[in-house]
């Protein structure tokens, strides 16, 4: 694997994992990985995009995840403070357009500019889920 995108913490957990994770902040990223595992799924990675992530850095994170051949769902868990939900939403939209083989996304966004993010994603028919538990359940549905 190449180096992880700047300002991110990327750790491979299982090359054969079926669920990739993206979160901001180490604690939230660990909670996301734990929730995926507690749901009976195998997390492929730990990916903390850090504070202040923008469209470019999030798009690079998606490209890094695409190196995992067995990933069949991506759980995205963002609590925005410095990072803005609308920037993450723009990256998600760009990734869906630029990466044809992108696995299904299970997205939870909260915090700064979440209303704007919801409008952007809704316009592209990309659903948001209310919480991490719903994301894990949706990932399980995609995999089964």
PLM feature spans:
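ATP-dependent carboxylate/acyl-activation modules
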Residues: 1-76, 109-144
């Amino acid at each position: 694997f190449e180096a992880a995108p700047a300002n991110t913490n990327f750790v491979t957990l299982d090359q054969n994992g079926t669920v990739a994770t993206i979160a901001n902040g180490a604690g939230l990223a660990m909670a996301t990985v734990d929730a995926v595992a507690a749901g009976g799924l195998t997390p492929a990675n730990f990916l903390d995009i850090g504070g202040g992530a923008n469209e470019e850095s999030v798009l690079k994170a998606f490209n890094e995840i695409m190196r995992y051949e067995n990933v069949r769902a991506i759980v995205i868990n963002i609590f925005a403070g410095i990072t803005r939900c609308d920037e993450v939403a723009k990256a998600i939209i760009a990734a869906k357009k630029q990466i044809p083989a992108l696995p299904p996304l299970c997205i939870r966004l909260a915090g700064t500019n979440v209303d704007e993010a919801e409008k952007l994603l809704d316009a592209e028919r990309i659903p948001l889920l209310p919480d991490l538990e719903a994301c894990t359940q949706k990932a399980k549905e995609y995999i089964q």
